């Protein structure tokens, strides 16, 4: 048993040598404090007027823990009293000037942020409009009919007659009706719907023919209907 206790102490000394040293130092401090308390107290008249001598005298007369607690309380009272000291006139003016300066700076920065956000929104809306116009310019030829498609699909059309039921005639020999396109609203028709309606018109006795003129610089500009009525009056497509 003694060997076990001795081995534990040796292990503790090797692992934590400061633990044994602290216990020894604490023992010496308590012994020194008891010796001082047993001595005769030093009269206050023998102490000097300096603050260090007063603290040293109090330290000799009172225990260490109580002295530290009292000193902490005195420091706390001193710091709290210093905080509640009324500032002078110059100090108040300086604080007011700093506050006004900070307030003006914050308001100016807030206005700059608002202007930056507004400019960002305007640029975003402007960019959206430009992108939409660009996309529309690229997508319109894909959705609406163009001049090469009309010439490719409607270069020759069948024409009904009393003698011959159907025959082929070139577009240059057919009369033009330019106002009919705008009146019927087929100028804005998409290409698939226009093909379907013209496909039904080719099978009817009354025939309407869609072509483009030579001066077609604008998109879907100068579009004409060529209509030919030989056996029946003109019918809607």
From Swiss-Prot:
Record-listed Phosphoserine modification sites: 79-81
Location of region: Disordered: 39-60
GO biological process: response to 11-deoxycorticosterone; response to dehydroepiandrosterone; response to estradiol; response to progesterone
Localization terms from the record: Secreted
Expression sites by tissue: Mammary gland specific. Secreted in milk.
InterPro entries: Alpha-s1_casein (IPR026999)
Induction: Maximal induction is dependent upon prolactin insulin and cortisol.
Keywords of the record: Milk protein, Phosphoprotein, Secreted, Signal
Primary location recorded for the protein, binned into one broad class: secreted
Record carries keyword Cell membrane: no
Signal peptide: 1-15
GO cellular component: extracellular space
Protein role: Important role in the capacity of milk to transport calcium phosphate.
Sequence similarity: Belongs to the alpha-casein family.
Name under which the protein is recorded: Alpha-S1-casein
Protein species of origin: Notamacropus eugenii
Gene: CSN1S1
